[in-house]
A protein has these predicted regions:
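Hydrophobic/aromatic beta-strand patches that form the interior of the parallel beta-sheet core
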Residues: 52, 81, 96-98, 117, ...
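A short, well-ordered alpha-helix in the C-terminal region of glycosyltransferases
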Residues: 161-175
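C-terminal "capping" alpha-helix adjacent to the active site of nucleotide-linked donor transferases
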Residues: 135-137, 143-161
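Acidic, glycine-centered active-site loop in nucleotide-sugar glycosyltransferases
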Residues: 113, 128-139
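A donor-sugar binding/catalytic signature common to diverse glycosyltransferases
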Residues: 86-128
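C-terminal alpha-helical cap of glycosyltransferases
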Residues: 174-188
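Donor-nucleotide binding loops and adjacent catalytic segments primarily
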Residues: 2-6, 11-93
Length: 188
């Protein structure tokens, strides 16, 4: 367990607002314009939420995120980083994660019982992850032809929906998986 007050201070966040953890997609910036569009749409909810946006190594993505922050009246509610080494800590204070459905981030989100908004999955495994998570009521996949504002409105302003997604996440996640794997290995 993490000291949440300390995490809010560490990232200069308000404990009085909900936090969205937003992963931009890494150094290749796949789906950059769509990613920027979704982040821009999320900034419409800064009266209730604050966003920790991680651009990855992609300098153009990072600059696009900063350009969004520059247009905001309340730019303090949008924190932009290339990288953070405290992902589990930030997840512990987050209400929602927006990410590509790669294995590591999804595993961390499940372990933190976080509802997930899926963006820009790579065809193949990531699309299969997105379909699976959506079928379990854990995630909502914002597809290419979807209107992100409609989807975000339905989730961000619907605490019942967020609670349901969180509950479904905790039903699927096995917080003892490491222990279980070690037990299996030790029996061999």
């Amino acid at each position: 367990n993490f000291d949440k007050d300390e995490i809010y201070k560490m990232f200069n966040l308000s404990p009085n607002k909900k936090t969205i953890l937003f992963f931009g997609g890494g150094e290749f910036g796949l789906g950059k314009s769509r990613t920027v569009e979704i982040l821009q749409t999320l900034t419409q909810y800064l009266d209730k939420y604050q966003i920790v946006a991680i651009s990855g190594k992609n300098k153009k993505m990072n600059q696009a995120f900063k350009d969004i922050a520059d247009t905001l009246e309340d730019s303090n509610s949008l924190k932009i980083y290339e990288f953070i080494d405290k992902v589990p800590e930030v997840m512990s204070i987050s209400s929602l994660v927006v990410t590509k459905p790669g294995g590591l981030t999804i595993s961390e989100s499940l372990a933190s019982s976080l509802p997930i908004l899926v963006i820009n999955p790579i065809p193949g495994q990531e699309e299969e992850n997105a379909e699976f998570l959506e079928s379990k009521g854990i995630a909502k996949w914002i597809k290419k032809d979807d209107n992100p504002k409609e989807i975000l409105e339905n989730i961000i302003n619907n605490q019942e929906k967020l609670d349901s997604m969180k509950k479904n996440t905790s039903l699927l996640a096995n917080k003892y998986s490491t222990h279980d794997i070690c037990s299996i290995l030790l029996k061999k």
